[in-house]
Amino acid sequence: MIPPLDVFSLKNDEPTWLGPAESLEKALEITRQNGIGSYLICSQRTGRKERYQVDANGTVRRTRGVQ
């Protein structure tokens, strides 16, 4: 079965695929592990895309929905 989420890092609004995730919790852990920056989490099931930001403290916040 294909994992339902894909995680991307965003640098200059260019996505780089970081890998799949089975849940939002696991997707957010991938973003934390990759450190400060902007990320995009995409649902394979719904097509929904959400942007997240990781700060210097390792806090992850949703910044805005893309679709």
Residue ranges and their predicted role:
Residues 4, 10-11, 32, 53-55:
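Intrinsically disordered, low-complexity peptide-like regions
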Residues 14-19, 48-50:
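Surface-exposed loop/edge segments in extracytoplasmic proteins
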Residues 36-67:
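Short, mixed-charge low-complexity intrinsically disordered segments
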